């Protein structure tokens, strides 16, 4: 099936990354997206982060024909935004490859005035609605508000205010070791799709099967314990 092909190619791409870094330094964020901590590998390969990313992306393209996009950041949050927002607005090279980079300073320069706020990782519509009710429409607004209104942010968002403030300034205290060692209170995962119209039974069964295959892949690549599965 098309989904099986998708899973096979995703596995092949993951194996390509493993030629360059240890599994301990890769976190599968989704079936087609990973975080990779290359910090310790740059001296070994005598490459910059951009050069190493380009090397891996080129090999993925050669092996699979898939054009990968990469975001490079000084922390996980900035790497995610570099890929999700910045890379979409830069020209691709001759092979269609886009690689974008962010550090704290370039993040503030490039994205403090970016809208909508929902483009930012972990900033959903509900959070944005509350922020806009207080005149906060950009990450720059949020950063400036946090200087004098930090207590008010904690009143509105509780402990979640801390991560909002950190992200407004381009900080992310959570690193690869923390997300690898995180143990959720439950061991459940889920997959969902929003259908644009009613589906007949045969097509609905195909969608359910594809989602089940995605869950299988996530279980296989997840760093969480699998005892009892």
Specify the residue positions occupied by each region the protein language model found.
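DNA-contacting surface of Y-family translesion DNA polymerases
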Residues: 119, 127-222, 226-229
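Gly/Gly-Pro- and Ser/Thr-rich, intrinsically disordered tail segments characteristic of DNA damage-repair
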Residues: 1-166, 176
């Amino acid at each position: 099936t098309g989904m099986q092909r998708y899973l096979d190619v995703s596995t092949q791409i993951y194996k390509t990354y493993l030629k360059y870094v240890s599994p301990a330094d890769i976190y599968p964020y989704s079936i087609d997206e990973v975080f990779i901590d290359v910090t310790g590998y740059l001296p070994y390969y005598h490459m910059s982060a951009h050069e190493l990313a380009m090397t891996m992306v080129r090999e993925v393209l050669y092996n699979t024909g898939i054009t990968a996009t990469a975001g490079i950041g000084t922390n996980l949050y900035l790497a995610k935004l570099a890929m999700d927002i910045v890379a979409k607005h830069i020209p691709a090279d001759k092979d269609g490859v886009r690689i974008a980079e962010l550090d704290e300073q370039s993040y503030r320069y490039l994205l403090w005035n970016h809208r909508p706020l929902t483009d930012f990782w972990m900033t959903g519509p509900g959070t944005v609605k509350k922020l806009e009710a207080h005149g906060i429409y950009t990450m720059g607004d949020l950063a400036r508000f946090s200087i004098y209104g930090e207590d008010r942010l904690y009143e509105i968002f509780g402990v979640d205010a801390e991560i909002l403030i950190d992200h407004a300034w381009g900080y992310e205290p959570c690193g690869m070791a923390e997300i690898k060692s995180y143990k959720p209170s439950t061991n459940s995962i889920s997959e969902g799709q929003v259908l644009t119209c009613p589906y007949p039974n045969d097509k609905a069964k195909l969608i359910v099967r594809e989602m089940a295959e995605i869950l299988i892949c996530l279980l296989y690549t997840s760093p969480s314990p699998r005892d009892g599965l």
